[in-house]
A protein has these predicted regions:
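Conserved nucleotide-cofactor-binding alpha/beta core module
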Residues: 65-187
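Class I SAM-dependent transferase core
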Residues: 1-73, 81-85, 89, 102-112, ...
Length: 205
């Protein structure tokens, strides 16, 4: 999977590739989908949600510039696969998931990995996780019409925020990357077109 689906598509960061090799995707995939666990596509995990395709998990970690020792927040953590990969890269990870059914499944699974640097919490990601801020990187694993101000405020100076943005309510989105400068200014760039499940919670109001 790592060689054929990720490295050959341009992800060469050794930390990303090592983490993708270390974290077994099949344990996050429902039993009925085990034969597809290492296919490069998203798979349903219940509650209308999906586990992201392996390439996209690697891509998000790569463009966020995640390095060991960084403080990273993930919003829309779902089953916990992306969070586990980020933790395997050596980051201190704070993962948020609003769907109770998914959080209930993810918590014992992630505990079995015994990753002291991975913290998973059931909560509305639109408010972020202010107690652990600021974050060197913030990754949205769900699509939002815009990034809440409360989340931007939790991004550290020099940090990067990666989010699929769906401004027109269509099925497809564009991943945007913001970088916060020393003066607190946010520089934005558009990266690639994607398709993520929509963010829920206060962002819908």
């Amino acid at each position: 999977m790592v060689r054929d689906q990720i490295a050959r598509r341009g992800i060469t960061n050794p930390r990303v590739l090592a983490a993708m090799t270390t974290v077994p995707r099949h344990v996050f995939v429902p039993s009925a989908r085990q034969d597809e666990a290492y296919a490069d596509r998203p798979l349903p995990i219940g509650a209308g949600q999906t586990i992201s395709q392996p390439y996209m998990v690697a891509y998000m970690a790569d463009v966020a510039g995640v390095e060991p020792g960084m403080c990273v927040m993930e919003i829309g953590a779902g089953c916990g696969y992306q969070a586990a990969v980020l933790a395997a890269m050596g980051a201190e990870v704070f993962a948020l998931e609003i769907v109770h059914e998914l959080a209930e499944q993810a918590l014992p699974l992630l505990s079995s990995f015994e990753l002291a640097n991975l913290h998973y919490h059931e909560a509305d990601g639109s408010k972020g996780w202010p107690d652990a801020a600021p974050y060197d990187a913030i990754i949205f694993s769900c699509a939002a019409p815009s990034v809440p101000d409360a989340v931007f405020e939790q991004l550290a100076v020099g940090g990067r925020l990666i989010a699929p943005v769906n401004a027109d309510s269509g099925d497809h989105q564009t991943i945007h990357r913001w970088h916060k400068t020393a003066g607190g200014t946010l520089h934005q760039e558009k990266l690639i077109s994607v398709r993520f499940v929509p963010m829920t919670g206060a962002i819908e109001e």
